[in-house]
Curated annotation (Swiss-Prot):
Stretch forming the signal peptide: none
Family as reported in the entry's similarity comment: Belongs to the complex I subunit 4 family.
Function: NDH-1 shuttles electrons from NAD(P)H, via FMN and iron-sulfur (Fe-S) centers, to quinones in the respiratory chain. The immediate electron acceptor for the enzyme in this species is believed to be plastoquinone. Couples the redox reaction to proton translocation (for every two electrons transferred, four hydrogen ions are translocated across the cytoplasmic membrane), and thus conserves the redox energy in a proton gradient.
TM spans (from-to): 7-27, 35-55, 86-106, 114-134, 135-155, 168-188, 208-228, 242-262, 276-296, 310-330, 331-351, 374-396, 417-437, 463-483
Organism: Synechococcus sp. (strain JA-3-3Ab) (Cyanobacteria bacterium Yellowstone A-Prime)
HAMAP family: NDH1_NuoM (MF_00491)
Protein name as it appears in the record: NAD(P)H-quinone oxidoreductase chain 4 1
Annotated GO CC locations: plasma membrane-derived thylakoid membrane
Top-level taxonomy: Bacteria, Bacillati, Cyanobacteriota, Cyanophyceae, Synechococcales
One GO BP annotation of this record: electron transport coupled proton transport
Keyword terms: Membrane, NAD, NADP, Plastoquinone, Quinone, Thylakoid, Translocase, Transmembrane, Transmembrane helix
Entry coiled-coil feature ranges: none
Pfam families reported in the protein's UniProt record: Proton_antipo_M
Membrane topology: Multi-pass membrane protein
């Protein structure tokens, strides 16, 4: 891979927030930190729009705008960045949600310099994860992102913030070990040491080594997505994190897990994926049903939304496991859609807490009269989350279903079982979301909740944040190509690569595709 442009545009996207963060301590007044952070976030987002609008070719499935500079040549470590259809939409999603999170944190008064410093560090690291093409650089950016999140929860979180932050860092740090194990297995597992993803994808590995690396990456990315039973850090983190951090946590950080699965497990370890894909499909179905059932039992608003996120990420797993272009399309669309929907719901949840000082569902109620704008936008976000036709959630889930049903890699009974379990989750989703709306906004207001003088509807700044998230949700729902055109050609190429790893004659079994050699051993049928 060689430098394809004279100006290192992708390096600018990563380094701008990372380096600009160190300018915050130099500001003469703390109140300037929010303006500074907003300027950096908006500039980076504008730079993304310019780069992808003028220098990116939507018709090309290969890596574009590639940059490669020797960093530590003694160990083959390069500053290697590139973008394709897998990373393009997620980079934009990261830029949009993080910039809006800065606006959402506008009234922060406790240590604003440190808060926005950490937020910009996290921003740059997220973009770096999506653009990195060197496994060691990918790992480095992944690790840089962990520390700001830990501190942002531990310092600005709720009463149990230390517990939630510690649980987050223990889970994610342990997961990082598996990224390192998988990376080293691939780097040393074939002739010629390399950390470059493109070079690793072109090499041939023993199947046993592929399975080892795949399992390691699956555990690491399964924690981040998260996948049941590696999910238990997420409800605690969401419960204690402030609203702006929950926006980024649900909107961007979870997508890093899905991106890692597609980029490494599917894109490079496609032969091992043949064996693990049925497991992913089952885990996806379990995620959907478990997340929906757990959400039903939550009395705390943010915990209900956290378990909802777990359920929605199950569709990503099923899409990845489908072996079809539609499945991969649906997985990416579900990540984009959920990122926007979760961000707006957690933002509006934070607004509700600011007004009422509680998120206990049995203590809320009757807020629709005092907060009609918040009620309308919260309802719109909830309807998008339950996959109402005309909104992005519907398109994402429908595409995943079609990808699974049209797959010829599984027996019809297996596909029907997965689809049935997913359908159970879809039926439960409106139950826990609509009951949540009823408990928060309908009924009689608890007289001990808060004085009416403290209740106020959305202000213009808050309306702007919510609408900037809801409009893309509606736009993608009505015209999905707004999102799918960014990755269509890439998913076609990845799906073709996956199908080349399947047996020449696909023999359908309830769980695993059967290798051609096993066909001869089967008794003849009448």
């Amino acid at each position: 891979m060689s430098n394809s442009l004279e100006f290192p545009w992708l390096s600018a996207l990563v380094l701008l927030p990372l380096l600009a963060a160190f300018g915050i301590p130099l500001l003469p007044q703390s109140r300037w930190a929010r303006w500074y952070a907003l300027a950096v976030g908006a500039l980076d987002l504008g730079l993304m729009a310019y780069i992808f609008g003028w220098h990116y070719d939507l018709r090309d499935f290969s890596l574009q705008l590639a940059e490669r500079y020797a960093w530590v040549p003694q160990i083959g470590f390069h500053w290697s960045l590139a973008v394709d259809g897998l990373s393009f939409p997620l980079v934009l999603l990261s830029g949009l949600i993080t910039t809006l999170a800065i606006v959402a944190a506008w009234n922060l008064t406790h240590k604003p310099r440190l808060f926005f410093f950490l937020l910009l560090l996290m921003y740059g690291a997220q973009v770096g994860v999506f653009l990195a093409q060197d496994l060691l650089l990918f790992f480095l950016m992944w690790e840089i992102e962990l520390v700001p999140v830990y501190l942002l929860i531990a310092i600005w979180g709720g009463p149990q913030r230390q517990y939630a932050a510690t649980k987050f860092i223990l889970y994610t740090a342990a997961a990082s070990i598996f990224i390192l194990v998988g990376s080293l297995a691939m780097a040393f597992g074939s002739e010629g040491f390399s950390l470059e993803m493109a070079e690793l994808g072109a090499k041939s590995y023993p199947l046993a080594l592929q399975i080892l690396a795949y399992a390691a990456f699956l555990i690491a990315f399964g924690v981040k997505l998260p996948v049941f039973p590696l999910h238990t850090w997420l409800p605690d983190a969401h419960s204690e994190a402030s609203a702006p951090i929950s926006m980024i946590l649900a909107g961007v950080l979870l997508k890093m897990g899905g991106y890692g699965l597609i980029r490494l497990n599917v894109g490079i370890l496609s032969e091992a994926h043949v064996y693990f894909a049925p497991v992913l499909a089952v885990l996806g179905a379990v995620n959907i049903v478990y997340g929906a059932l757990a959400a039903l039992g939550q009395n705390y608003l943010k915990r209900r939304l956290a378990y909802s996120s777990i359920a929605h990420m199950g569709f990503v797993l099923i899409g990845i496991a489908a072996f079809t272009e539609l499945g991969l399309n649906g997985a990416l669309l579900q990540m984009i859609s959920h990122g926007l929907i979760a961000a707006v719901l957690f933002f509006l949840t934070g607004i509700t807490y600011e007004r009422t000082h509680t998120l206990a569902l049995d203590k809320l109620g009757g807020l629709a009269k005092q907060m009609p704008k918040a009620f309308a936008l919260f309802t719109a976000g909830s309807l998008a989350s339950l996959a109402l036709p005309g909104m992005s959630g519907f398109v994402g889930e429908l595409t995943v279903f079609l990808g699974l049903i049209t797959s010829d890699a599984y027996a019809p009974t297996f596909k029907a079982g997965i689809a049935l379990l997913a359908a159970v989750g879809i039926i439960l989703t409106p139950i826990y979301l609509l009951s949540m709306l009823r408990q928060v906004f309908y009924g009689a207001q608890d007289p001990g909740l808060v004085l009416e003088d403290y209740l106020g509807d959305l202000r213009p700044r808050e309306m702007a944040v919510a609408l900037c998230l809801l409009l893309p949700i509606l736009g993608i729902g009505l015209y999905p190509r707004l999102a799918t055109q960014t990755y269509d050609v890439t998913t076609v190429a990845v799906a073709a690569q996956l199908r080349s790893a399947l047996p020449t004659e696909i023999v359908q079994r309830p769980l695993l595709p059967v290798q051609p050699a096993q066909v001869a051993a089967l008794p003849p049928t009448d």
